């Protein structure tokens, strides 16, 4: 039996990059996966041992997000696993931070995450799992990414609180915290930026999206049945040693 056989999973921010890798991995492990994105092409079908249904949803639009979960509840009846990956990261030092930058980042990285979790747990059976995609930025003060780091610290804090609140339902809440990862966004960075980041990673390379997906799968599945309220860094040791 595959790791997520017969599970209903939702990946908010599940198109391309880390989120896309998680959605595809969950489907190949037997889950029926609803993956949201502002750019998703609606449709979907069989993938490996499961099914993948892309859905076009702007997670920062709370009405659209609520409507999406109503559709999932109507079609699938429940959500066994929730992954919240939707987020943005923009450079701005303290002198340059604007209200728009702050609101835009917190609205997607924190507010959307909170209300996705609220909607999902309303139709999640006991024994479900929530995986929040955080970042090692919650633990290190990267110049120019103060607002982003603060949103990821909020993610970490919510995981602790929700793990306590949902424990009576045996719903586990954990964070997977990637370090620099080889995505299309990272590929667009300058060679200098990539080289500088790589030098800070003890393993000497950036992470791969499939490595992040493997960590998310572990936290989503019964393989981590005695883990809740935790953060799993997947950063090549960057923020650990």
What are the language-model segments listed below?
Residues 8, 15-16:
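Conserved glycine-rich cofactor-binding loop
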Residues 93-94, 98-106, 186, 193-197:
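Substrate-binding pocket helix/loop in short-chain dehydrogenase/reductase
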Residues 95, 127, 140-146, 168, ...:
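Active-site loop immediately N-terminal to the catalytic Tyr-X3-Lys motif
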Residues 117, 151, 159:
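Active-site helix of classical SDR
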Residues 122-123, 164-168, 225:
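Alpha-helical segment proximal to the catalytic Tyr-Lys
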Residues 135:
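Residue(s) in the substrate-gating loop at a strand-loop-helix junction
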Residues 140, 217, 228-241:
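Short C-terminal tail/terminal secondary-structure segment
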